[in-house]
Amino acid sequence: MIINEELQNVRLSQILKDALIKATDTYSTPPQIIWIDNSTIATLGNFSASTGKAKAKKTFNVSALVAASLANGQVLNYHASLPEGKRRILYVDTEQSRYHCHNVLERILKLAGLSTATDNENLDFICLREYTPAVRIEVIDYALSHNEGYGLVIIDGIRDLLLDINNAAESVEVINKMMEWSSKYNIHIHCVLHLNKGDNNVRGHIGTEMNNKAETVLVISKNSNTPNISEVKALHIREKEFKPFAFTVNEQGLPELATDYDSSEDEHGKSAPLKYTDLTIE
């Protein structure tokens, strides 16, 4: 019993030592890695999210964000620059079949202007559909601890890291994992969330946590006048807000900018502003 108490004291003493911030400490500004126009939406050591209702084309949007990061260039309005030594990307899909995951992988490579005939050493795409939430978390943790060079991690969708999406404690634990991984491995994590349809089911817990902790939350929604157009706006952003943009999916199944889109044209049909309590995990 005494030995256990001593071990606990050593553990807590080490945590306290590691957590202490001194006036004499120096910290560099977190590297910015992804922008929309001139607004920073992602830095290393933080996490962000994109959200939207079903069929809003959230995964198409994430594909563009990943492609820009893979190419260290621009796709849609996303511009990315991952530093040397942080060029690798881990994409975790928890809900789609291997066939549909492969489609997303090919889409990312095409958007990045890369060959689909060879594997890219900077993109690891894993499908964890058939595993339990606990195993999924273990696998992600193992991948991060045993592979060097990751700068960006995508988790699509994060709801599958929980057993009960109504459980406040589980929601806090998952968000804490995002903060732990992003800080420990100096990476940026982007999660995909689902937007409530307007009822009172599964509301509040994850929304509150995202409000307090996420660097950026993007909203992807269908244009009320032109349903085949998906709009991208900021629900929450620590940086200055960017001008909303929109995209469509072309005949090749790739997202492209909607050139004739006017962000002001949808004002008359706009619903009440979104709140974090309208979010649930996906």
Regions found by a protein language model. Name each.
Residues 83-166, 253, 261-266:
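Conserved inter-motif catalytic segment of the P-loop NTP-binding fold
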